[in-house]
Swiss-Prot record:
Belongs to the eukaryotic ribosomal protein P1/P2 family. Keywords: Ribonucleoprotein, Ribosomal protein. Residues 69-91 are annotated as: Disordered. Part of the 50S ribosomal subunit. Homodimer, it forms part of the ribosomal stalk which helps the ribosome interact with GTP-bound translation factors. Forms a heptameric uL10/P0(P1)2(P1)2(P1)2 complex, where uL10/P0 forms an elongated spine to which the P1 dimers bind in a sequential fashion. Pfam families: Ribosomal_60s. One of its GO terms (biological process) is translational elongation. Residues 74-90 have a biased composition (Basic and acidic residues). Forms part of the ribosomal stalk, playing a central role in the interaction of the ribosome with GTP-bound translation factors. The gene is rpl12. This is Large ribosomal subunit protein P1. GO terms for cellular component: ribonucleoprotein complex; ribosome. InterPro entries: P1/P2_N_sf, Ribosomal_P1/P2, Ribosomal_P1_arc. It comes from the Archaea.
Length: 102
C-alpha cells in the first residue's frame, strides 16, 4: 500500500509520478524500496486519470447494497428448485412403492 500512497501523495502535490519520485517518497518515509514494485506501479499508472479512478472507486461502495438483491433472488430460485426436486423424488418414491404393492 505504501507504493500506492506514494503515488497518490505525488499526484496530490502536483508532481509527476516517476520511478525516482516514488523511490524518494518511500525512502523519506523509511520504507525499503523494491525496484520491481516501483516499476510495476509506474507502468500500471501510465495513461490512468487518477482523479477519475478515485471518483469511480468511491461510487461502487454506495452501489454495493443494491447488488445484494439479485443474489437473494438467485438464492430463492435455488431453494425453489430444491423443493421441486424433493417433490419429484417423493413422487417417484411413492410410485415405486405403489408398483410393489400394486
Amino acid at each position: 500500500m505504501e507504493y500506492i500512497y506514494a503515488a497518490l501523495l505525488l499526484h496530490s502535490a502536483g508532481k509527476e509520478i516517476t520511478e525516482d519520485a516514488i523511490k524518494a517518497v518511500l525512502s523519506a518515509a523509511g520504507v525499503e524500496v523494491d525496484d520491481a514494485r516501483v516499476k510495476a506501479l509506474v507502468a500500471g499508472l501510465e495513461g490512468v486519470d487518477i482523479e477519475e479512478a478515485i471518483a469511480n472507486a468511491a461510487m461502487p461502495v454506495a452501489a454495493a447494497p443494491a447488488a445484494a438483491a439479485p443474489a437473494a433472488a438467485a438464492e430463492e430460485k435455488k431453494e425453489e428448485e430444491k423443493k421441486e426436486e424433493k417433490k419429484e423424488e417423493d413422487t417417484a418414491a411413492v410410485a415405486g412403492l405403489a408398483a410393489l404393492f400394486g
